[in-house]
Regions:
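Intrinsically disordered, low-complexity terminal regions
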Residues: 5-7, 12-109
């Protein structure tokens, strides 16, 4: 797959129906990241709004490598879109998304 780098912010539905490749968003997202995605990775360094309920949180990663760049985190790692049987990955910068901290309780189980 290829790599798309967005040096600013994006609207809704980034990566809709995505099957592979990588998208790096250096700014914010208006939400609904990865709707209907089946594969690939989306990395958001800014605020992402909310995560679709068809994604599950897997872990917190200290870094993410995208293209030739290793980006320091930490990052929340989500998998989905489970409604589509997808195995796409969302890497969401923890520092920019305090609204997601409540999801960490699902990691302790």
């Amino acid at each position: 797959g290829g790599l798309i780098i967005v040096d600013g912010s994006v609207g809704q539905f980034v990566g809709y129906g995505m099957r592979g490749g990588d998208i790096l968003v250096r700014g914010n997202s208006s939400g609904r990241l990865g709707a209907s995605m089946k594969g690939g990775r989306i990395v958001v360094l800014g605020n992402c709004g909310s995560i679709l309920p068809s994604f599950t949180i897997l872990e917190i990663r200290p870094t993410v490598r995208i293209g030739e760049e290793r980006i320091k985190g930490p990052f929340y790692l989500f998998q989905g879109d489970l409604n589509e049987g997808g195995s796409g990955r969302l890497f969401i910068a923890k520092a920019s998304n305090p609204q997601l901290i409540a999801l960490e309780r699902y990691l302790e189980a």
